[in-house]
Amino acid sequence: MKQDEDGPSFSYELLSVSSKVADRLEAALEPLGLSLAKFGALSKLVAAREPIPLSTLAERCACVRSNITQLVDRLEADGLVSRADDPHDRRSIRAELTDEGRRRQAAGLRAIEKVERELLARVPKASQETLLGLLRSLHLSS
């Protein structure tokens, strides 16, 4: 991260904002017993609308299989996800949301939306769409 005489560079500012936003989101999710990682996995399962193989969940969460296994272990221990055999592939295990998992994901979504509203309140209305578009343009393809 390069800094010039006038202050932090673009990448430093972006990382700083990203870290602060992540901290606020984690703090909003913590009372629900969720982390950003848990919320992300639950959200991918909600979007799937059906049980999905752990390998697919790992892809959608952009993490390796061993990490998703540990994450699903924690979600299962919390009663938010259950594992089910894949009827089409006996070697594969699918992750499935429980009713509590759906409720907790919905509550997490509300908590995140509240943080987003608070953050966007700092940006003039006329600039909000532009900001979102600029942020989306920075996504790097893998």
Residue locations for each model-derived region?
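Residues in the helix-turn-helix
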Residues: 67
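N-terminal leader segment of winged-helix/HTH proteins
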Residues: 1-32, 78, 137
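C-terminal regulatory/oligomerization modules of transcriptional regulators
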Residues: 1-6, 125-142
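Charged, amphipathic alpha-helical coiled-coil/dimerization segments
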Residues: 22, 53, 73-133
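Pre-recognition alpha-helix immediately N-terminal to the DNA-recognition helix
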Residues: 13, 24, 40-44, 103, ...
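N-terminal helix-turn-helix DNA-binding core of bacterial DNA-binding proteins
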Residues: 19, 23-64
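Active-site phosphate/pyrophosphate-handling residues
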Residues: 9, 40, 118
